[in-house]
Amino acid sequence: MGYDSRLDHLAATSWYPFFNNVTTRGEIIEPYSLTLDEACQFLKIS
């Protein structure tokens, strides 16, 4: 899957929980219901 560095920036800031299922400590946690594709669509229309 292609990766957008802008998403990496977003993931590192306020959007982090929506794009990642890993905590800031690097622990694997339960996956969020929002997928990456869904999040991208949300950002495009918001």
UniProtKB/Swiss-Prot annotation:
Protein's name in the database: Protein YpdJ
Source species of the chain: Escherichia coli (strain K12)
Record's miscellaneous remark: It is missing about 100 C-terminal amino acids compared to orthologs.
Consequences of knocking out this gene: Loss of H(2) production on minimal glucose, complex glucose and complex formate medium. Alters production of organic acids when grown on minimal glucose medium. This phenotype was not complemented by reintroduction of the ypdJ gene.
Function as written in the Swiss-Prot or TrEMBL entry: May be involved in H(2) production during fermentative growth.
